[in-house]
Design a protein with these regions (language model features):
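Exposed low-complexity, polar/acidic, P/S/T/G-rich flexible segments that act as propeptides
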Residues: 316-377, 386-388, 395
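Single conserved hydrophobic/aromatic residue that forms the stacking wall/gate
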Residues: 1-7, 11, 492-500
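Extracellular beta-strand ligand-recognition surfaces/modules
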Residues: 53-57, 84-94, 121-123, 133-136, ...
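Extended intrinsically disordered, low-complexity coil regions enriched in Ser, Thr, Gly, Ala
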Residues: 318-343, 440-480
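Low-complexity, serine/threonine/proline-enriched polar segments
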Residues: 107-257, 360-371, 375-376, 475-492, ...
Length: 500
């Protein structure tokens, strides 16, 4: 996604939560023990091994800004978040059964006249027993009013009677909170983010979107406004990936970020970069989470051949929080780790390559061009023009980027490499240019010519190839492009002839 915003409202009772353990104001107790989650299917290739997906990558705005600009204007507390919490990702197989009844619920399976024909009843409400056929409503107002009522299958008035004994009678609330809950017992009503009532009450953006994900009434046929007030044109459906089956399998890799004030530093929490805006009021952090190194594994999952879902949830938050994301993406690469041993022969012990030895990523002019006193900015290599995107009305330069390799504990005489398969005919090419930047990891000391970079190209990786090796100078922030080579291909052929 290009950009998104998520409100972690740890006090608010969310959709289809009938836990009666509420405060007198109708809020959830013990917010740190609660969680809020969103799930979506992986809509493109689910074989992460084939596509070589290596990272979950995104930019996040600092959620712990001081002062007025950092207040979470949720309409209840309107305070800054000062305590932090956990942001957790699940990749793999995640249950689609939102209502936990092993029945495939979809709104357009409900009776168009609100009768009980083809309906089953359980602790969650009314659910269809029909076979799922199409993802469209019947196109008339009466049917829409009787089907667009959420996954509980109940209209607001019927929710009160249905959950009276197991939920409402157990509540001890103020009159205001009681009235609010009785108006929408399942907390699933949709509210569009524009409206005269919102304008009159001067509602801020978080309050405007607070009920935008509601499932009841989010697909009206008509509207009394001069804009479309739909949340979605399609019926709600538990089948997220639309494969006509309801999966309740839970087997996934889990990745945890512990977000706390004072811990948002490069090198911690998978933070690899940060940008401070020109006004100095906000900081954006770039996260790059290596998916091959999960924090935990749940269930029976052993590879990345079928990654069908991603689930994101917040927990351990004592206070409401807003997380603002930009460029949330799964990052793959044409380059793959070279797993064969490159250790120089001799009497030394041969080490085994591990995932922690090397990380593959990219740096780009649009995301990594701001440096600091201790960090070099990324710049376009000299003589390399940025491509122009001619497919848009306004011509723009594309994002120029380069391969980045990060090494840990690279021992003397050892080498690590990446490779990609290609089919180049170099007969009409004259030269090979390489531009290389080298810098030590934080806290490490690295001297000029202590490491080298090498390029191999040929018909295979072990016996039939040309190799160019370049000892590296450590790049200083004020002196860029200190390493590079510009070699004529004809010279490589001459050197090869002399060698043999």
């Amino acid at each position: 996604t290009p950009s998104s915003r998520g409100l972690g409202d740890v006090y608010k009772r969310q959709q289809y939560n009938y836990n009666p353990d509420l405060t007198s104001s109708g809020l959830l107790k013990n917010p740190a023990s609660n969680f809020g989650a969103i799930t979506r299917s992986i809509s493109n290739d689910t074989d992460f091994d084939r596509t070589n997906v290596q990272y979950i990558e995104f930019w996040m705005m600092d959620p712990f800004i001081d002062g007025e600009n950092g207040k979470v204007l949720d309409g209840i507390f309107n305070n800054n978040n000062t305590t932090g919490g956990k942001l957790i990702f699940n990749l793999g197989n995640v249950s689609e059964d939102l209502m936990k009844d092993n029945i495939h619920a979809f709104e357009n399976g409900l009776s168009s006249d609100y009768s009980d024909s083809g309906i089953k009843f359980n602790e969650w409400g009314r659910v269809t027993s029909k076979q799922y056929l199409t993802k469209f409503f019947e196109n008339d107002n009466n049917s829409r009013e009787n089907q667009d009522i959420g996954l509980d299958g109940l209209k607001d008035a019927n929710e009160v009677d249905y959950f009276q004994q197991n939920f409402i009678d157990k509540l001890t609330l103020t009159s205001e909170a009681n009235e609010r809950i009785l108006s929408d017992v399942s907390a699933d009503n949709f509210k569009y983010y524009l409206g005269e009532d919102l304008d009159v009450n001067n509602k801020k953006i978080l309050e405007r979107y607070k009920n935008f994900n509601g499932m009841e009434g989010n697909t009206p046929l008509t509207s009394n406004t001069n804009f479309s007030s739909q949340g979605s044109p399609f019926p709600e459906n538990e089948d997220l990936n639309e494969d006509n089956t309801l999966s309740d399998l839970e087997s996934y890799y889990e990745y945890e970020l512990d977000l706390r004030p004072g811990s948002m530093n490069i090198g911690q929490n998978n933070i690899v970069d940060k940008i401070i805006d020109q006004s100095g009021n906000a900081t954006w952090y770039q996260f790059r989470i290596p998916i091959r190194n999960p924090d935990r594994i749940h269930g029976n999952i052993s590879d990345f051949k079928t990654i069908r879902f991603i689930r994101t949830y917040l927990t351990d938050w004592d206070e409401p929080v807003v997380l603002r994301f930009a460029k949330f993406q799964m990052v793959g690469s044409q380059w793959r780790k070279y797993d064969s041993n490159l250790y120089q022969s001799g009497l030394n012990e041969v080490s085994e390559i591990t995932d922690s030895d090397m990380q593959i990523s990219v740096v780009s002019i649009e995301e990594n061009s701001i440096g600091s006193d201790t960090k070099s900015p990324y710049v376009v290599p000299p003589g390399i023009p940025r491509d122009i995107d001619n497919t848009t009305i306004v011509q723009r330069r594309t994002n120029e980027q380069s391969l980045q390799l990060c090494f840990n504990d690279l021992s003397d005489g050892d080498a690590k490499a990446v490779f990609k398969e290609s089919n180049f005919d170099l007969i009409n090419y004259g030269r090979i240019k390489m531009f290389i930047h080298a810098e030590p990891n934080d806290g490490d000391i690295l001297s000029d010519d202590e490491i080298s970079a090498f390029l191999r190209f040929g018909s295979d990786y072990e016996n039939n190839y040309y190799e160019i090796e370049l000892p590296l100078k450590i790049t200083r922030p004020s002196l860029l492009n200190q390493n590079g080579s510009n070699i004529a291909l004809s010279l490589i052929h001459i050197w090869r002839c002399r060698r043999f």
